[in-house]
Amino acid sequence: MEDVAGRLPGHGLYVLPTMDRIGRLLKKNGDTANLDGVVQRCGIALSRRFLDGLGLAKRAGVVRRGLREAEALLQAGHKPLLILAANIATHSRQKFEGVVHRYAVDEWVELLDSVRLGAACGWSESVVLAVNDPGLERRLRVDAFRWQTFHRKVDA
């Protein structure tokens, strides 16, 4: 069973799922036939959890869309979570990096594509989003970290 929220009862240990760890576990148990299905289910569940959190933030009214609105939050002294679509254009990435450098933002998340990020908020494509609520920001950071960890290739 996939526990993407990290809430199942246990002994206080939560192992971050990665494709490699899941593969090793299934090979160890002799169940390699299910590998693709389990990996796909985990990837979908992690994406869905992040996008659900983003939709929740939108309904709470704490999501800003676009580089200008994100920069306005930074200029006002806020420290929002900046979310960048993985399919951002080179020119837009350069603008984003300029803003990040100007306001000394040391951390942002880059994942999924602009269509999925926008759809989670009920918009068309959205390349840059800013979430300005500490609680939702924390949840989205954790979910983004789990998503990125899952999709990272690990050699061991």
List the model feature ranges, each with a label.
Residues 1-31:
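N-terminal cysteine/histidine-rich coordination modules
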Residues 2, 8-9, 103-148:
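Short basic, glycine-rich beta-strand/loop surfaces that mediate nucleic-acid
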Residues 6, 23, 40, 67-71, ...:
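Positively charged, polar, low-complexity stretches
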Residues 20-84, 90:
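Extended interfacial segments that mediate partner engagement and assembly in macromolecular machines
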Residues 25-26, 93-94, 140:
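Short glycine-/acidic-enriched loop or helix-start segments at secondary-structure transitions
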Residues 29-30, 96-99, 123-124:
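Short, glycine/charged-enriched secondary-structure capping and boundary segments
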Residues 85-87, 132-133:
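Structural motif
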Residues 102, 152-156:
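N-terminal targeting/trafficking signals and adjacent low-complexity tails
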